[in-house]
Amino acid sequence: MAFVVGLTGGIASGKTTIANMFAELGATIIDADIVARQVVTKGSPLFLKIVQHFGQQVLTTQGELNRAQLRQLIFANQVEKNWLNNLLHPAIRREMLIQLRQARGPYVLFVVPLLIENKLIEFCQRVLVIDVYPEVQLARALTRDRSNIATIRGIMASQVNRLTRLSYANDIIENNLPLAESLERLQMQVQQLHQYYLTLATQQE
């Protein structure tokens, strides 16, 4: 099995941006958000179950899953949220582990918002936390996702709090500033961590 670094952080912490920097250096990326889209592609078994359960209201005009609409629905209703999580989380976990077994490259970056909550941390040799203040998360998510503030607060409440997440961290990248102001520092940190992970991966072989 490859050397695995779990990359996690709350909503709008910059996980994808930083994961892409690692990818450019040669790390293999397995991203839970991408896998979550793959398992509900139009016509797939899970897609059909979701449409059957929630109805046409969760579809776009192109007949694909409207993830924003679905998110609004479930965060207002704990029963529906549990139903969807019980359907999706095992499927996402299975697919991520399949991709992990097939992974090639010096090491794997396991990009998972709910790494701790869904106990995927057990597959990681190291945990990298992208750390952001809650007020920064909220402001970014409001701008990026165009969701209402209640929905975003609901997402944040469903994730472990900042201090709990940090308690699991082996490595931390602080990402509170706008990208234009912090890009050079982030790239340097990623480069240093990449070299460190290469060394650890070699030692594991």
Swiss-Prot record:
GO cellular component, alphabetical, reads: cytoplasm
Can you say where in the cell this protein is located?
A: Cytoplasm
Q: Which UniProt keywords apply?
A: ATP-binding, Coenzyme A biosynthesis, Cytoplasm, Kinase, Nucleotide-binding, Transferase
Entry's Gene Ontology BP terms: coenzyme A biosynthetic process
The EC class name is transferase
Its EC number(s): 2.7.1.24
Q: Which domain of life is it from?
A: Bacteria
Q: Which InterPro entries match?
A: Depp_CoAkinase (IPR001977), P-loop_NTPase (IPR027417)
Q: Which PROSITE patterns match?
A: DPCK
* Catalysis performed (reactions): 3'-dephospho-CoA + ATP = ADP + CoA + H(+)
Predominant location category: cytoplasm
Gene3D superfamilies according to UniProt: P-loop containing nucleotide triphosphate hydrolases (3.40.50.300)
State any single GO MF term: dephospho-CoA kinase activity
* Pathway where it operates: Cofactor biosynthesis; coenzyme A biosynthesis; CoA from (R)-pantothenate: step 5/5
All copies of the DPCK domain together span 4-204
SUPFAM superfamilies named in the record: P-loop containing nucleoside triphosphate hydrolases
Sequence positions that bind ATP = 12-17
Q: Which family does it belong to?
A: Belongs to the CoaE family.
Quote the function comment for this protein.
Catalyzes the phosphorylation of the 3'-hydroxyl group of dephosphocoenzyme A to form coenzyme A.
- Report the HAMAP family cross-referenced here: Dephospho_CoA_kinase
The name this protein goes by in its record: Dephospho-CoA kinase
